[in-house]
Amino acid sequence: QVLPALAVVFTVTLLMSVMLWVLKAVYGTPVSQFGVYLQSHIRFNTYIGLTSMALIFGAAGMQVFAMIIAFVIPLVNVLSVLGFSQGQGLSYKNIAWSVAKNPLILACLVGIIFNFSGMHLLESMSQSLKLVAGMSLPLGLLCVGAALQFNALKYAGRALILNTFGRLIFVPILAYVGCLLFGLATFETMIVVVFFSLPTASAAYVLTKYFQGDSQLMAAIISLQTLCFGLTFPLWMWFLQ
């Protein structure tokens, strides 16, 4: 059941990226802003995603979500870096290394290996990890709150609005259509649409700053998307019900 969901996620992510690159060519968007636009539409906040999946779908939903992010995180990281690559003298070896050492990717890969190999942890180690896991989501949400930059919302404009609601409304619609075309079951459809309704990752600001992109706009988009998610997410859940 995970493979069709992965197919939709990859298709929508790549399609959204291609659409943005086409718009960049048409409107001559500067690289410093294009990287922001791209991240705003394809990256996602893992902590909010895990919390949402745990509360709404339980263990089954978290398992599917974990499989999705394990394969999608490398893709969105590479695409995000490529969004800033023009004229940056980018080393593809450095891209591969930065993706390979991403702790979220490593954690997901280890989990997948254990899941498919049938190996089991010692009971004492398993209990310890369960305690850590119980703390991880609340701590992750605290980090999300701490990363919000409300002053950046003064950086208002059409780009802020378009990149906020493009992510929270247009991309989930695209995902829902993709689920219908791929014939996904209701459960997987809900997970995929919820995945694409998540706000962009707080780490997008760090990458934007590193490549000397429009970090002020990125901070504003992250903050507004995260705030508006509280309004759009219930609407999507109502629609999917």
Feature annotation, model-predicted:
Residues 1-241:
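Alpha-helical transmembrane segments of multi-pass small-molecule/ion transporters
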